[in-house]
Each structure stands twice: as structure tokens, then as C-alpha cells.
Amino acid sequence: MIMKTYFSGVSTLGVHSLATEDYGFFPLSVDQKTMERMKNVLDIPATQLNISNSSLIGSLCVGNSNGLLVPDITTEKEVELIKMFLKENSLDVNLERLKAKNTAFGNLILTNNKGCIISEELSRFRKTIEDVLDVESGVGNYAELPTVGSNGVATDKGCLVHPLTDELELEWIQNILRVDYVERGTANRGVTSVGACILANSKGAVVGGDTSGPEILKIEEALDLID
């Protein structure tokens, strides 16, 4: 199932939220009706919060069913809210505050529950990232861009990436994430940073409200969401 929506008129949903197979985080600005619809489409418990006193949740955090990485500028109150949410939903998730010069972990890491791709900008933290997310990783860029997280969206079934990703890079991504499908595409009528526009897991996807019909078809194919 795929749902189209905006967050207060904004279509870059992946910048402002995070979705995994088992949980989701959304900005405080999202109304309750939209929250319930997204929770239903993705079939996950979710909560609303800030990270580092910011709504840029998807840019700053990265997570999967095993772990969650947040920047060390995340406040104690925010960390406690996350811990409380995880406990209330009986989720055994490793939560790590990582100190790094570049705090945009969501932009620089692409992960599912089988593997992760780490931007060269975070290569020195590879072991920590692997341990927290409990997956093996590959370090590198694709489409000549270091922002591997914001230029891709991955689930345990498939992956959609920047349209300039070449064939060798597609094969590399597929091998690391261990998915059946890796496709190139766009969202929000031509935006190439698909990770900034889409929230997805193996059960559904939420896409920016500007996303066209042909783009939705490609997203469904790449993420294996066609019924």
C-alpha cells in the first residue's frame, strides 16, 4: 500500500521522519489523522518528537529493527522519550548517541535489516555503525554523491536510488543490502533525492504529495509493493 501526503505543505517526508520495519518517528507538526493513516500503511507503532530540537528527524537519525543511531547533539529529554517509546512497544533496539563532525546520519547511511551502505564521510565509524545496526556494511558513494541515505530508500525487499546510479553501483547496492530489486527513480515530480521524499518498509510506503503516478509505479516495483 502506498499513501501520498504532505507534512504542513512539505513533500520531503524523508527529511522529517524515519520509518523501519518495526517503528517510526514523525515530526510534531503532523496531525493525528495523518499519523494514524501512516501507522496503518506502514503497520508500525510510531511517535512524534524532535531530534536535537529539530524536526529534521530523517536527516539526523538512521535506524533499523536492531538499532538506532542519533547524533550526540540529541538532548537527554529526547533520548528518554525514545527509550520510553521503545519500552512501551516492547522493542529491543540498540540506541546509540554517536559523536561525529557530520551529524546528518540519515543522509549518509542507507540501511535495512540485512546490510547498510555507509558514506565515505563516516567511514571511520564503520565498526560502531555495524555493531549498533547489527548488519554488515559497505563503504562508498554512488551516483558520485556522498549522501547515500538521502539518495536512496531501502527495505528488506527492495531499494530505489538516484537515477544517475550506474549498473556496477546497482549491483554493489543489491549485494550489500541483500534485496531482490534495486531500481533507479525519482519522487515528487523529478526530485532525485528519493530518500528525502519517501518513507517505506516491506509493508508499505508513504510518499511526498507531489509524487506522480509513474513515479509511484516505479516505487512499487523497486520496493516490491505491488499486490
Swiss-Prot record:
Query: Which biological process terms from the Gene Ontology are attached to this UniProt entry?
Result: cytosolic ribosome assembly
**Keyword flag Protein biosynthesis:** yes
What's one GO MF term for it? translation initiation factor activity
Q: Does the keyword Protein biosynthesis apply?
A: yes
The record's listing under InterPro entries reads: eIF6 (IPR002769)
Record-linked Pfam families: eIF-6 (PF01912)
Keyword entries, A-Z: Initiation factor, Protein biosynthesis
Question: Which PANTHER family does the UniProt entry name for this protein?
Answer: TRANSLATION INITIATION FACTOR 6
Q: Which NCBIfam families match?
A: eIF-6, PRK04046.1-3
Q: What family is this protein classified in?
A: Belongs to the eIF-6 family.
What's this chain's function? Binds to the 50S ribosomal subunit and prevents its association with the 30S ribosomal subunit to form the 70S initiation complex.
Q: What is this protein called?
A: Translation initiation factor 6
Taxonomy of origin reads: Archaea, Methanobacteriati, Methanobacteriota, Methanomada group, Methanococci
UniProt gene name:
eif6
